[in-house]
From Swiss-Prot:
Free-text comment on the cofactor: Binds 2 [4Fe-4S] clusters. One cluster is coordinated with 3 cysteines and an exchangeable S-adenosyl-L-methionine.
Positions contributing to [4Fe-4S] cluster 1 binding: C12, C48, C82
GN (gene name): miaB
Organism: Saccharopolyspora erythraea (strain ATCC 11635 / DSM 40517 / JCM 4748 / NBRC 13426 / NCIMB 8594 / NRRL 2338)
CDD domains named in the record: Radical_SAM
Protein name: tRNA-2-methylthio-N(6)-dimethylallyladenosine synthase
Species lineage: Bacteria, Bacillati, Actinomycetota, Actinomycetes, Pseudonocardiales
One GO location term (cellular component): cytosol
General function of this protein: Catalyzes the methylthiolation of N6-(dimethylallyl)adenosine (i(6)A), leading to the formation of 2-methylthio-N6-(dimethylallyl)adenosine (ms(2)i(6)A) at position 37 in tRNAs that read codons beginning with uridine.
Length: 491
């Protein structure tokens, strides 16, 4: 009898993409995706360990599943991802109804571990300390018909004092340029219009094979792939953000003028305590160069409020950088103490009420800036890649949603001849009529509508399914010279 599965994903884009790999492996092993109205035979939690409430969220959700497990002993529950890598066997101690625990380094073991647990009728816990196989070797069931994630590396060599990710995902491992471009080409061949290049520190790409200009070259090579309309990347580190990457962004037509670059703090003293290896002026200088090369660039960031020892003066320095940077938007976080990180042991842990008050002030400032920046775009014509389910009120307002080339979310009204014809994955042109802090609105006429293969696939329920690229871990040393190829690999 065919068994069904459901994957619940928490955390960053890396986890979202890892879940696509998990789905691809399960389907290759004969599982089918569970419908929304049935209990799955296998539930997989792909977890995050970055925020303090990650533990509570996981164990709360596991508790909610226990009655279903009691009713159906054949149901299996698996826990993977960063929290599994951290907590290991503690998970089955706290939730003994869990069947499988696997980490960030052995995604490919999941089908085997499920079968072993079912056969042995006991929990299987397998956590590796380094990569078993590179994730790109695993098949993937893609979630989107029009947009795809492509990892350029896994792991991180930075030692930020607040971050537990390097301890859980390991040192940086880079894929070879040809492997990356082959995966991008495979996605485009399936109708995908947009790819996002992923890495914990994406612009450090090339460190493993000694080419500090490798990421800029990779962007330019993506520009040679016919049919690839949009290229994005996340997340870069200011320390490694070089002028050649700015030039590649500005000079490669399909690379989007969008930059998400974490600031974390505007205080040089706090940045030093965070081990961020840049200072606020260096950060602002990068933004200046980006805007000189691409005046239309949308720049977003991450900011942590309430890092241990942060003074009112430190916080005001962050507010000043935010005023100068004029971010299109910012992901703001209250500092979360994570056991196992140096920051967790630092003196000067701030009272919750102080952190909350500063957080509220930062949110108020950034919302106003986002709104002001958005209002400058009213009257501008934009090209939108129509997206699925990004507008919470789309059903009520009869609007659809899409992403502009700079990544901004735009809600638009498909009236007239295109009413009922526009699908996720299609491309439309319209004009911005109104701005809000977190989105733009285009209630004007649709001036152009292009139906795409991606839209056809969305309508048919077809999603790309890519096989693994290459075998084993990437080799060390410089990559071999790439022959002239259709995808224009010049790395």
């Amino acid at each position: 009898m065919t068994r069904s599965y459901q994957i619940r994903t928490y955390g960053c884009q890396m986890n979202v993409h890892d879940s696509e790999r998990l789905a691809g492996m399960l389907e290759d092993a004969g599982y089918v995706r569970a419908g929304t109205d049935v209990d799955p035979d296998v539930v997989v939690f792909n977890t995050c360990a970055v925020r303090e409430n990650a533990d509570n969220r996981l164990y709360g959700n596991l508790g909610h599943l226990r009655p279903a497990k009691d009713r159906n002993p054949g149901m299996q529950i698996a826990v993977g991802g960063c929290l599994a890598q951290k907590d290991r066997g503690e998970i089955v101690k706290r939730a003994p109804w869990v069947d499988v625990v696997f980490g960030t380094h052995n995604l490919g073991s999941l089908p085997t571990l499920l079968e072993r647990a079912r056969h042995n009728e006991e929990a299987e816990v397998e956590i590796l300390e380094s990569l078993d196989v590179f994730p790109s070797t695993l098949p993937a069931r893609r979630e989107s018909a029009y947009s795809g994630w492509v990892s350029v590396s896994v792991g991180c060599n930075n030692t930020c004092t607040f971050c537990i990710v390097p301890a859980l995902r390991g040192k940086e491992k880079d894929r070879r340029p040809g492997e990356i471009l082959s995966e991008v080409q495979a996605l485009v061949s399936e109708g995908v219009l947009e790819v996002t290049l992923l890495g914990q520190n994406v612009n450090a790409y090339g460190v493993e094979f000694g080419d500090r200009f490798a990421f800029g070259k990779l962007l330019r090579s993506c520009g040679e792939i016919e049919g690839l309309e949009r290229v994005r990347f996340t997340s870069p580190h200011p320390r490694d953000f070089t002028d050649d990457v700015i030039a590649a962004m500005a000079e490669t037509p399909n690379v989007c003028h969008q930059l998400h670059m974490p600031l974390q703090s505007g205080s040089d003293r706090v940045l030093k305590q965070m081990r961020r290896s840049y200072r606020s002026q260096r950060y602002l200088d990068i933004l200046r160069k980006v805007r000189e090369a691409m005046p239309d660039a949308a720049i977003t960031t991450d900011i942590i409020v309430g890092f241990p020892g942060e003074t009112e003066e430190d916080f005001e320095a962050t507010m000043q950088v935010v005023r100068e940077a004029r971010f299109a938007s910012a992901f703001t976080f209250q500092y979360s103490k994570r056991p196992g990180t140096p920051a967790a042991e630092m003196e000067g842990q701030l009272p919750k009420e102080v952190v909350q008050q500063r957080y509220d002030r930062l949110i108020e400032l950034q919302n106003q800036i986002s709104w002001d920046v958005g209002k400058e775009l009213v009257g501008r014509s934009v090209e939108l890649l129509v997206a699925e389910g990004e507008g919470r009120k789309d059903t009520e307002t009869h609007r659809l949603s899409g992403r502009a080339r700079d990544g901004r979310l735009v809600h638009f009204t498909p009236v007239g001849a295109v009413d009922g014809q526009v699908r996720p994955g299609d491309v439309v042109h319209t004009t911005i009529t109104r701005a809000a802090p977190h989105h733009l609105v285009a209630d004007s006429e649709i001036t152009a509508h292009r139906r795409t293969r991606a839209g056809d696939h969305w309508e048919e329920g077809v999603r790309p399914k890519t096989s693994g690229v290459s075998l084993g871990l990437p080799s060390f040393g410089a990559p071999p010279a790439q022959p002239a190829a259709q995808q224009g690999c010049a790395c």
